[in-house]
Amino acid sequence: MEILTLKNISFSYKDKVIFDNYNFVMNKEEIIAMIGPSGCGKSTLLKIINGLETDYSGDVLLDGVNVNNIPVNKRDIVLMFQDNLLFPHMTIFENIEFSLKMEKYPKHEIKKMVEEVAKDIHLQDKLNKYPKELSGGQQRRVALARAVISKPKLLLLDEPFTGLDKEIKLEIMNLVKIIREKYNTSIIFVTHDLSEAEYLKAKYIEFKKGESL
């Protein structure tokens, strides 16, 4: 069953064609890796899918519905950036709950959801701490927890394993596996490293610098 369809996506940047009538189909609960060097359009495509980039032609369909016809807060698509973008003045609990508070979930429901995702992402003992008290790998886990707390249908990860040492990288990759299996989430991630796609048993799309798709 298809969850994401891109139809005839065209996009240019500074007179350079990045996508030229690009088509793509993703099935539910798949993991797909976008592999290639910097500057070849991988992150741009995530932004097109997520709705942050709107200056393109073509159609992005989620479950067969054009995303432009779905209110932003109902799209069930979450993008996690390479920079963790945590709020330094908020506790880890407050960082994770932020999107739920914006959507005005009931307080008792928020608490339950934060505690559940904190357990899944191994953050139970960090909820009262602040980002500066956590290591880089722990901060990445917080960003991941915040991204998946609403259990989106589609999770977009922009270089989620970059800048991590080997042990922490493996830990984060295993958490991505857990998210897909437990939350039935479809996942697209950007990487430069084919071994990450192989470890996650992901299908992959290869991007080449200087060539449009």
Positions of PLM-derived features:
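ABC ATPase NBD coupling module
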Residues: 66-81
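Helix-to-loop junction immediately C-terminal to a conserved catalytic motif
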Residues: 50
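A short, proline-enriched helix->beta-strand linker immediately N-terminal to the Walker B motif
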Residues: 149-153
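Conserved ABC ATPase "signature" region
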Residues: 108-126, 177-178
